[in-house]
Protein backbone atom coordinates (compact mmCIF):
# COMPACT_ATOMS: atom_id res chain seq x y z
CA UNK A 1 0.00 0.00 0.00
CA UNK A 2 2.72 2.35 0.97
CA UNK A 3 4.58 1.42 -2.18
CA UNK A 4 1.54 2.18 -4.28
CA UNK A 5 0.98 5.52 -2.54
CA UNK A 6 4.59 6.51 -3.07
CA UNK A 7 4.41 5.55 -6.73
CA UNK A 8 1.22 7.57 -7.17
CA UNK A 9 2.77 10.62 -5.45
CA UNK A 10 5.84 10.34 -7.69
CA UNK A 11 3.64 10.30 -10.81
CA UNK A 12 1.77 13.40 -9.65
CA UNK A 13 5.06 15.26 -9.06
CA UNK A 14 6.32 14.32 -12.51
CA UNK A 15 3.07 15.52 -14.14
CA UNK A 16 3.22 18.87 -12.30
CA UNK A 17 6.86 19.35 -13.33
CA UNK A 18 5.95 18.72 -16.98
CA UNK A 19 3.09 21.24 -16.91
CA UNK A 20 5.33 23.88 -15.35
CA UNK A 21 7.95 23.36 -18.04
CA UNK A 22 5.35 23.75 -20.79
CA UNK A 23 3.92 27.01 -19.36
CA UNK A 24 7.27 28.67 -18.66
CA UNK A 25 7.69 31.86 -20.70
CA UNK A 26 10.04 31.56 -23.62
CA UNK A 27 12.57 34.33 -24.28
CA UNK A 28 11.48 36.68 -27.09
CA UNK A 29 13.83 36.60 -30.02
CA UNK A 30 14.27 39.99 -31.73
CA UNK A 31 12.97 40.06 -35.27
CA UNK A 32 15.54 40.90 -37.90
CA UNK A 33 15.25 44.44 -39.28
CA UNK A 34 14.13 43.95 -42.83
CA UNK A 35 14.04 47.69 -43.69
CA UNK A 36 17.35 49.12 -44.86
CA UNK A 37 18.55 52.37 -43.37
CA UNK A 38 17.48 55.38 -45.38
CA UNK A 39 19.81 58.29 -45.79
CA UNK A 40 18.25 61.59 -44.71
CA UNK A 41 18.23 63.95 -47.67
CA UNK A 42 17.97 67.66 -46.87
CA UNK A 43 14.74 68.76 -48.55
CA UNK A 44 14.46 72.43 -49.40
CA UNK A 45 11.09 73.04 -47.82
CA UNK A 46 9.95 75.77 -45.51
CA UNK A 47 9.32 73.15 -42.83
CA UNK A 48 13.02 72.21 -42.91
CA UNK A 49 14.07 75.69 -41.91
CA UNK A 50 11.09 76.34 -39.64
CA UNK A 51 13.29 75.51 -36.66
CA UNK A 52 15.08 78.78 -37.33
CA UNK A 53 11.84 80.72 -37.05
CA UNK A 54 10.36 81.74 -33.72
CA UNK A 55 6.59 81.61 -33.45
CA UNK A 56 5.47 85.15 -34.21
CA UNK A 57 2.21 84.66 -32.32
CA UNK A 58 4.13 83.69 -29.18
CA UNK A 59 6.35 86.78 -29.10
CA UNK A 60 5.59 89.14 -26.25
CA UNK A 61 3.93 92.33 -27.34
CA UNK A 62 2.73 90.98 -30.68
CA UNK A 63 -1.06 91.06 -31.03
CA UNK A 64 -2.88 88.31 -32.85
CA UNK A 65 -3.26 89.02 -36.54
CA UNK A 66 -6.80 90.13 -37.35
CA UNK A 67 -6.99 90.40 -41.10
CA UNK A 68 -4.50 90.80 -43.90
CA UNK A 69 -4.63 94.10 -45.74
CA UNK A 70 -3.97 94.84 -49.36
CA UNK A 71 -0.25 95.71 -49.73
CA UNK A 72 -0.84 98.85 -51.76
CA UNK A 73 -4.42 99.97 -51.16
CA UNK A 74 -5.87 102.94 -52.95
CA UNK A 75 -7.71 104.11 -49.84
CA UNK A 76 -7.04 103.22 -46.19
CA UNK A 77 -10.05 103.40 -43.89
CA UNK A 78 -9.85 104.51 -40.26
CA UNK A 79 -12.68 104.71 -37.76
CA UNK A 80 -13.50 108.34 -38.55
CA UNK A 81 -11.46 109.17 -41.65
CA UNK A 82 -10.02 107.72 -44.84
CA UNK A 83 -6.58 108.27 -46.31
CA UNK A 84 -5.01 107.92 -49.74
CA UNK A 85 -1.83 108.80 -51.64
CA UNK A 86 -2.41 111.48 -54.26
CA UNK A 87 -0.10 111.87 -57.25
CA UNK A 88 -2.48 113.81 -59.44
CA UNK A 89 -0.20 116.83 -59.93
CA UNK A 90 2.77 114.88 -61.30
CA UNK A 91 4.87 111.79 -60.76
CA UNK A 92 7.50 113.93 -59.02
CA UNK A 93 5.21 114.96 -56.18
CA UNK A 94 3.08 112.84 -53.89
CA UNK A 95 1.12 113.53 -50.74
CA UNK A 96 -1.09 111.81 -48.21
CA UNK A 97 -4.63 113.16 -48.12
CA UNK A 98 -7.22 112.70 -45.39
CA UNK A 99 -10.99 113.04 -45.67
CA UNK A 100 -12.94 113.44 -42.43
CA UNK A 101 -16.49 114.75 -41.90
CA UNK A 102 -16.68 115.64 -45.58
CA UNK A 103 -13.54 117.79 -45.42
CA UNK A 104 -10.36 116.93 -47.33
CA UNK A 105 -6.86 117.98 -46.27
CA UNK A 106 -3.27 117.20 -47.19
CA UNK A 107 -1.39 115.92 -44.14
CA UNK A 108 1.98 114.94 -45.66
CA UNK A 109 3.90 115.85 -48.81
CA UNK A 110 6.91 114.16 -50.40
CA UNK A 111 8.79 116.12 -53.04
CA UNK A 112 10.76 113.19 -54.44
CA UNK A 113 7.67 111.26 -55.56
CA UNK A 114 8.75 108.08 -53.76
CA UNK A 115 5.76 107.91 -51.43
CA UNK A 116 4.08 104.48 -51.55
CA UNK A 117 2.37 101.74 -49.56
CA UNK A 118 0.01 103.30 -47.03
CA UNK A 119 -1.08 101.30 -43.97
CA UNK A 120 -2.91 102.08 -40.74
CA UNK A 121 -2.50 100.57 -37.27
CA UNK A 122 -3.14 101.69 -33.70
CA UNK A 123 -3.61 105.37 -34.51
CA UNK A 124 -0.55 105.62 -36.77
CA UNK A 125 -0.05 105.77 -40.53
CA UNK A 126 2.82 103.78 -42.04
CA UNK A 127 4.25 104.39 -45.50
CA UNK A 128 7.37 103.64 -47.53
CA UNK A 129 9.59 106.37 -48.93
CA UNK A 130 13.21 106.77 -49.97
CA UNK A 131 15.24 106.09 -46.84
CA UNK A 132 12.95 103.52 -45.26
CA UNK A 133 9.55 103.05 -43.67
CA UNK A 134 8.03 106.08 -41.96
CA UNK A 135 5.19 106.53 -39.52
CA UNK A 136 3.10 109.52 -38.43
CA UNK A 137 -0.07 110.24 -36.41
CA UNK A 138 -3.37 109.73 -38.20
CA UNK A 139 -4.38 113.37 -37.80
CA UNK A 140 -1.14 114.61 -39.30
CA UNK A 141 2.05 115.97 -37.81
CA UNK A 142 5.72 115.13 -37.94
CA UNK A 143 6.65 111.92 -39.74
CA UNK A 144 9.49 109.90 -38.23
CA UNK A 145 11.82 107.49 -39.99
CA UNK A 146 10.88 104.30 -38.20
CA UNK A 147 12.69 101.51 -40.09
CA UNK A 148 15.80 102.85 -41.87
CA UNK A 149 16.51 101.00 -45.08
CA UNK A 150 13.10 99.34 -45.20
CA UNK A 151 11.41 99.06 -48.57
CA UNK A 152 8.37 97.06 -49.65
CA UNK A 153 6.50 95.87 -46.59
CA UNK A 154 3.33 94.20 -45.41
CA UNK A 155 1.46 94.99 -42.20
CA UNK A 156 -0.88 92.56 -40.48
CA UNK A 157 -1.84 92.18 -36.85
CA UNK A 158 0.45 95.02 -35.83
CA UNK A 159 3.55 93.37 -37.30
CA UNK A 160 5.44 94.80 -40.26
CA UNK A 161 7.28 92.33 -42.48
CA UNK A 162 10.06 93.72 -44.62
CA UNK A 163 13.57 93.03 -45.85
CA UNK A 164 16.61 94.71 -44.29
CA UNK A 165 20.11 94.43 -45.68
CA UNK A 166 21.69 93.40 -42.37
CA UNK A 167 18.90 91.26 -40.93
CA UNK A 168 17.34 89.77 -44.05
CA UNK A 169 13.62 89.03 -43.98
CA UNK A 170 12.36 90.17 -40.57
CA UNK A 171 9.30 91.12 -38.55
CA UNK A 172 9.00 94.22 -36.40
CA UNK A 173 6.28 94.99 -33.86
CA UNK A 174 4.50 98.13 -35.01
CA UNK A 175 3.42 99.23 -31.53
CA UNK A 176 7.00 99.27 -30.21
CA UNK A 177 9.39 101.21 -32.47
CA UNK A 178 12.36 100.19 -30.31
CA UNK A 179 11.74 96.47 -30.79
CA UNK A 180 13.08 94.76 -33.90
CA UNK A 181 12.82 90.98 -33.89
CA UNK A 182 14.45 89.12 -36.81
CA UNK A 183 12.12 86.31 -37.83
CA UNK A 184 14.29 84.69 -40.46
CA UNK A 185 17.77 85.32 -41.73
CA UNK A 186 18.93 83.11 -44.56
CA UNK A 187 22.47 82.76 -45.89
CA UNK A 188 21.38 84.14 -49.22
CA UNK A 189 19.76 87.54 -49.13
CA UNK A 190 16.09 87.57 -50.08
CA UNK A 191 13.88 90.43 -51.12
CA UNK A 192 10.10 90.77 -51.09
CA UNK A 193 8.82 90.93 -54.64
CA UNK A 194 5.11 91.05 -53.91
CA UNK A 195 2.61 90.46 -51.12
CA UNK A 196 -1.08 89.63 -51.44
CA UNK A 197 -3.70 88.97 -48.73
CA UNK A 198 -5.66 85.73 -48.50
CA UNK A 199 -8.08 84.38 -45.92
CA UNK A 200 -6.10 83.55 -42.80
CA UNK A 201 -2.77 85.09 -43.79
CA UNK A 202 -0.52 86.83 -46.29
CA UNK A 203 1.28 85.34 -49.28
CA UNK A 204 4.83 86.62 -49.83
CA UNK A 205 6.76 86.24 -53.07
CA UNK A 206 10.43 86.16 -52.07
CA UNK A 207 13.32 86.04 -54.52
CA UNK A 208 17.07 85.84 -54.35
CA UNK A 209 18.71 89.21 -54.59
CA UNK A 210 19.85 88.84 -58.20
CA UNK A 211 21.19 91.63 -60.45
CA UNK A 212 18.29 90.96 -62.79
CA UNK A 213 15.15 91.98 -60.86
CA UNK A 214 13.00 89.56 -62.88
CA UNK A 215 15.24 86.50 -62.42
CA UNK A 216 16.26 84.24 -59.58
CA UNK A 217 14.76 81.55 -57.40
CA UNK A 218 11.24 82.37 -56.25
CA UNK A 219 9.57 81.22 -53.04
CA UNK A 220 5.81 81.53 -52.65
CA UNK A 221 5.45 81.61 -48.87
CA UNK A 222 2.25 81.74 -46.84
CA UNK A 223 2.25 83.32 -43.38
CA UNK A 224 -0.90 82.33 -41.52
CA UNK A 225 -2.44 84.40 -38.75
CA UNK A 226 -1.29 81.80 -36.24
CA UNK A 227 2.29 82.74 -37.06
CA UNK A 228 3.04 79.53 -38.97
CA UNK A 229 4.91 79.57 -42.28
CA UNK A 230 4.21 77.33 -45.25
CA UNK A 231 6.04 76.98 -48.55
CA UNK A 232 3.40 76.87 -51.28
CA UNK A 233 5.65 76.90 -54.32
CA UNK A 234 9.32 77.04 -55.26
CA UNK A 235 10.43 77.62 -58.82
CA UNK A 236 12.98 79.23 -61.09
CA UNK A 237 11.84 81.70 -63.69
CA UNK A 238 10.86 85.27 -64.37
CA UNK A 239 8.77 87.14 -61.85
CA UNK A 240 5.05 86.86 -62.68
CA UNK A 241 3.71 89.88 -64.46
CA UNK A 242 0.77 90.31 -62.10
CA UNK A 243 -0.19 88.73 -58.78
CA UNK A 244 -3.59 89.02 -57.13
CA UNK A 245 -5.82 86.95 -54.87
CA UNK A 246 -9.35 86.09 -53.92
CA UNK A 247 -10.46 84.56 -50.62
CA UNK A 248 -8.36 81.39 -50.73
CA UNK A 249 -6.39 81.40 -53.99
CA UNK A 250 -3.44 83.27 -55.43
CA UNK A 251 -3.60 84.04 -59.14
CA UNK A 252 -0.75 85.27 -61.30
CA UNK A 253 0.04 85.80 -64.94
CA UNK A 254 3.22 84.97 -66.74
CA UNK A 255 4.05 86.10 -70.24
CA UNK A 256 5.98 83.79 -72.56
CA UNK A 257 6.88 83.78 -76.24
CA UNK A 258 3.62 81.91 -76.84
CA UNK A 259 1.43 84.41 -75.02
CA UNK A 260 0.20 85.17 -71.52
CA UNK A 261 -0.95 82.36 -69.23
CA UNK A 262 -3.02 82.39 -66.05
CA UNK A 263 -1.93 80.30 -63.02
CA UNK A 264 -3.59 79.49 -59.72
CA UNK A 265 -2.25 78.38 -56.33
CA UNK A 266 -4.69 76.99 -53.77
CA UNK A 267 -3.61 78.36 -50.39
CA UNK A 268 -5.34 75.52 -48.52
CA UNK A 269 -3.27 72.66 -49.92
CA UNK A 270 -0.70 74.38 -52.15
CA UNK A 271 -2.15 72.90 -55.36
CA UNK A 272 -0.66 74.56 -58.44
CA UNK A 273 -2.23 74.66 -61.90
CA UNK A 274 -2.01 76.49 -65.21
CA UNK A 275 -5.54 77.44 -66.20
CA UNK A 276 -4.77 78.24 -69.80
CA UNK A 277 -3.78 80.96 -72.22
CA UNK A 278 -5.51 84.32 -72.14
CA UNK A 279 -7.07 85.47 -75.42
CA UNK A 280 -5.59 88.58 -76.98
CA UNK A 281 -7.81 91.37 -78.23
CA UNK A 282 -7.16 93.02 -81.63
CA UNK A 283 -5.85 96.18 -79.95
CA UNK A 284 -3.19 94.21 -78.08
CA UNK A 285 -4.95 94.33 -74.71
CA UNK A 286 -5.46 90.97 -73.08
CA UNK A 287 -9.11 90.22 -72.63
CA UNK A 288 -11.11 89.62 -70.56
CA UNK A 289 -9.78 92.05 -67.98
CA UNK A 290 -6.00 92.07 -67.74
CA UNK A 291 -5.02 92.56 -64.07
CA UNK A 292 -1.90 94.67 -63.73
CA UNK A 293 -1.50 96.05 -60.22
CA UNK A 294 -2.32 93.36 -57.71
CA UNK A 295 -5.96 93.67 -56.70
CA UNK A 296 -8.29 92.40 -59.41
CA UNK A 297 -10.73 90.38 -57.34
CA UNK A 298 -13.59 92.38 -58.76
CA UNK A 299 -12.61 91.43 -62.30
CA UNK A 300 -12.31 87.73 -61.59
CA UNK A 301 -15.52 87.53 -59.60
CA UNK A 302 -17.92 89.74 -61.53
CA UNK A 303 -16.45 89.81 -64.99
CA UNK A 304 -19.15 90.12 -67.62
CA UNK A 305 -22.07 89.93 -65.18
CA UNK A 306 -23.57 93.20 -66.30
CA UNK A 307 -26.94 92.99 -64.57
CA UNK A 308 -25.37 92.28 -61.19
CA UNK A 309 -22.52 94.76 -61.08
CA UNK A 310 -23.89 97.50 -63.34
CA UNK A 311 -20.35 98.30 -64.46
CA UNK A 312 -19.40 98.44 -68.12
CA UNK A 313 -16.37 99.08 -70.25
CA UNK A 314 -16.18 99.46 -74.02
CA UNK A 315 -16.53 95.71 -74.58
CA UNK A 316 -19.14 95.18 -71.85
CA UNK A 317 -16.44 94.00 -69.48
CA UNK A 318 -14.54 95.92 -66.86
CA UNK A 319 -11.13 95.86 -68.55
CA UNK A 320 -7.96 97.48 -67.33
CA UNK A 321 -6.40 99.71 -69.93
CA UNK A 322 -9.78 100.64 -71.41
CA UNK A 323 -12.04 103.61 -70.81
CA UNK A 324 -14.32 103.08 -67.85
CA UNK A 325 -18.07 103.40 -68.27
CA UNK A 326 -20.41 103.05 -65.33
CA UNK A 327 -24.16 102.60 -65.13
CA UNK A 328 -25.57 105.32 -62.87
CA UNK A 329 -28.24 104.99 -60.21
CA UNK A 330 -30.59 107.08 -62.37
CA UNK A 331 -30.48 104.46 -65.17
CA UNK A 332 -28.21 106.60 -67.33
CA UNK A 333 -24.75 105.93 -68.69
CA UNK A 334 -21.83 108.00 -67.46
CA UNK A 335 -18.65 107.88 -69.53
CA UNK A 336 -15.39 108.56 -67.76
CA UNK A 337 -12.37 108.99 -69.98
CA UNK A 338 -10.21 107.20 -67.45
CA UNK A 339 -7.42 104.82 -68.41
CA UNK A 340 -8.11 102.26 -65.70
CA UNK A 341 -5.14 101.06 -63.61
CA UNK A 342 -6.45 99.52 -60.41
CA UNK A 343 -9.67 98.54 -58.68
CA UNK A 344 -10.35 98.06 -54.99
CA UNK A 345 -13.56 96.80 -53.41
CA UNK A 346 -14.75 97.49 -49.86
CA UNK A 347 -18.10 96.58 -48.29
CA UNK A 348 -19.30 100.14 -48.92
CA UNK A 349 -17.57 101.26 -52.08
CA UNK A 350 -15.56 100.57 -55.20
CA UNK A 351 -12.40 102.59 -55.85
CA UNK A 352 -10.92 103.08 -59.31
CA UNK A 353 -7.48 104.47 -60.01
CA UNK A 354 -6.52 105.66 -63.47
CA UNK A 355 -5.23 108.42 -65.70
CA UNK A 356 -7.61 110.98 -67.11
CA UNK A 357 -7.22 111.50 -70.85
CA UNK A 358 -8.72 114.98 -70.53
CA UNK A 359 -5.97 116.51 -68.40
CA UNK A 360 -3.43 113.69 -67.95
CA UNK A 361 -3.85 113.62 -64.17
CA UNK A 362 -3.87 110.45 -62.09
CA UNK A 363 -7.14 110.25 -60.19
CA UNK A 364 -8.94 108.07 -57.69
CA UNK A 365 -12.69 107.72 -58.09
CA UNK A 366 -15.10 106.29 -55.55
CA UNK A 367 -18.48 104.69 -56.23
CA UNK A 368 -20.57 104.03 -53.14
CA UNK A 369 -22.95 101.10 -52.93
CA UNK A 370 -26.45 100.94 -51.48
CA UNK A 371 -27.73 97.38 -51.44
CA UNK A 372 -27.52 96.12 -55.00
CA UNK A 373 -27.55 99.62 -56.46
CA UNK A 374 -24.93 102.29 -57.01
CA UNK A 375 -25.76 105.18 -54.76
CA UNK A 376 -23.33 107.96 -55.43
CA UNK A 377 -20.08 108.63 -57.24
CA UNK A 378 -17.41 111.18 -56.50
CA UNK A 379 -13.73 111.75 -57.13
CA UNK A 380 -11.33 111.85 -54.19
CA UNK A 381 -9.63 115.11 -54.97
CA UNK A 382 -6.69 116.66 -53.14
CA UNK A 383 -7.26 120.01 -51.41
CA UNK A 384 -6.96 123.11 -53.54
Predicted segment positions?
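Beta-strand-rich domains and repeat architectures in extracellular enzymes and scaffolds
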Residues: 57-94, 110-117
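Repeated scaffold domains used in trafficking and secretory/extracellular systems
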Residues: 68-77, 113-121, 148-157, 188-199, ...
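Structural motif
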Residues: 90-97, 132-134, 166-172, 210-221, ...
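Short loop/turn segments that connect beta-strands within beta-propeller blades
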Residues: 99-103, 137-141, 173-178, 223-227, ...
Amino acid sequence: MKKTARLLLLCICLLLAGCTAQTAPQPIQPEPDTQPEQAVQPARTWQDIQAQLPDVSAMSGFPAAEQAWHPEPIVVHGEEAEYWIDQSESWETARICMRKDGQTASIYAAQDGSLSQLALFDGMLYFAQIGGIYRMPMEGGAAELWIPGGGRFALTGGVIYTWLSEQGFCAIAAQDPEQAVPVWKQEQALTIKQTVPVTGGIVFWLAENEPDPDAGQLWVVLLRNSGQWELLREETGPMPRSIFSDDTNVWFMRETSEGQFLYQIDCKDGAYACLGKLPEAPDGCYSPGTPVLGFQRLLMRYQGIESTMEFYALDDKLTLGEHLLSYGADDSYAIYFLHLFEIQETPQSFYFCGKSEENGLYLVSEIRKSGDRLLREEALQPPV
